[in-house]
Amino acid sequence: MISQVERDLSIQNRLPGSDHTTPSPPTSPHLCRSRSKSSSVSGQQQSRNVAHRLSWIILSVLLRRQGILLFAPIIYISCMLFHLHAASFDASPIIHRRPAPGSVYRSPQVYARLRGEIEADNTTADAISTIWKRSYKGVEWKPCVNMSTGVLPVSNGFIFIEANGGLNQQRTSICNAVAVAGYLNATLVIPNFHYHSIWKDPSKFGDIYDEEYFIDTLANDVRVVDTVPEYLMERFDYNLTNVYNFRVKAWAPTSYYRDSVLPKLLEEKVIRISPFANRLSFDAPRAVQRFRCLANNVALRFSKPILTQGETLVNKMKGLSANNAGKYVSVHLRFEEDMVAFSCCVFDGGDQEKQDMIAARERGWKGKFTKPGRVIRPGANRLNGKCPLTPLEVGLMLRGMGFNKSTYIFLAAGPIYSANRTMAPLLEMFPNLQTKEMLASEEDLAPFKNFSSRMAAIDYTVCLHSEVFVTTQGGNFPHFLMGHRRYLFGGHSKTIQPDKRKLAVLFDNPKLGWKSFKRQMLSMRSHSDSKGFELKRSSDSIYIFPCPDCMCRKNKTTASAT
């Protein structure tokens, strides 16, 4: 019969983790005699078995859970992504970036802070009396466009163009058409003015310019007629749309007209070019530039009604500013609703302004600003100098440049956006400000009132004869004026061109002081003075820079004609 000790040992030897896979033999009788030795060996064996058992349990758990280990990386990455996604939503509302200096319209706050100092500035000398005294530096230019006296050769045919855009874009087309006709020895038909839904002006050439004077002035250089001869129109069923039309690329070189247009002109005897805005390169031979000079500076004269009304307003402005020897400042202000809307800039009109601009953009450009992916950045526009100056900013700038409260200013502008509110600060700084509507009666302006180009022509005339011209936004109007003024005033444009990027930063400076601002404005004025004399480079517009193609040095005893 097996003893109890043997049974216990037999059970113990069958547990997982024992040293043997088979049962151990019975204990030696010798070992059984010594209880102490037997107990010691048994304790060591039990301790080892417990450790082995625990190790096996841990290993078996890990082996059974190896499927989880395979998915551990995926689970880890998913948790990290979820955490980052949640963190981004939680963090975005509490990130407050300070707008870049110059990106926010704060000019009203600047004016409120400087207003007292502006009023207290007791400067007696008006800048208008001294502004251009150091301009010429011994270099002066004079008009130098010779007109032909010989007989023109037989014409190669008739060219008919359509001039599109506003007053001065049409003027560009007219001058370029004269140049092309002269270059190709063609006869120019009086250009047709294309009606545009934005300008809404049905005026014809003769309504704006003196047509007879135009034809007579060019008679020995370029033939100009008012219509295509009947014998040619008969071929096209008296319909100009049946005439072969060239769709010329913008800024086409003269070689294109020689190689492509002239052969067709010789074949058809009449051609049409539509549209014709900016269809001739500014980098043209000297002979072609002469035609441009002749057309722009000599042949194009406003029609008698416009010229008379314009000269009347010039005389009124000179009379009002008699204390300054008849000198006045003209400002071309572009703060009409369509300009404000197109600029996509934000001013101080709040929700009402926002709604007005949305409506104006939709009326004028029908979805252009709401296309998918179109991003409007008002702050970036302001930093880049693309926001039109407000009446308030123009006033601050001119006062900083040294023009005092008594200066007479002529404002050339369309209907100013929110005029009652936006014009108040400018009128406060310059109470002698005038517009054509203030200088002329409703009856005097009635023939021009519903025609934007005719009204612009009156503004152009008054600005042309001012002592100082201030441009606040780019465009054809100031560009033509600057060139025309250079032609009249010895090569100097007598024009202030603000650095709008610099102004944006200054008007956004909460610590700006009046003396510091004045220094900055006087520096800007001086820079405009130095840029008054500029010679045309190859790619420049001859309508902005008439020297040296249309002018020659006055201090030379003999000057070669262009």
From Swiss-Prot:
Protein location: Membrane
InterPro entries assigned to the protein according to its UniProt record, in alphabetical order: FucosylTrfase_pln, GDP-Fuc_O-FucTrfase
GO molecular function: glycosyltransferase activity
Pathway as given in its UniProt record: Glycan metabolism
GO biological process: one example: fucose metabolic process
Glycan-linked positions: 122, 146, 185, 239, 404, 420, 450, 555
Location of the region described as Disordered in the Swiss-Prot/TrEMBL record: 10-46
Keywords: Carbohydrate metabolism, Fucose metabolism, Glycoprotein, Glycosyltransferase, Membrane, Signal-anchor, Transferase, Transmembrane, Transmembrane helix
Membrane topology label: Single-pass type II membrane protein
Biased composition (Low complexity): 37-46
EC nos: 2.4.1.-
Main location: membrane
CDD domains associated with the record: O-FucT_plant
Any one of the GO CC terms: membrane
Family that this chain belongs to: Belongs to the glycosyltransferase GT106 family.
PANTHER family xref list: O-FUCOSYLTRANSFERASE 4, O-FUCOSYLTRANSFERASE FAMILY PROTEIN
Listed name of the protein: O-fucosyltransferase 4
The organism's taxonomic lineage, starting at the top: Eukaryota, Viridiplantae, Streptophyta, Embryophyta, Tracheophyta
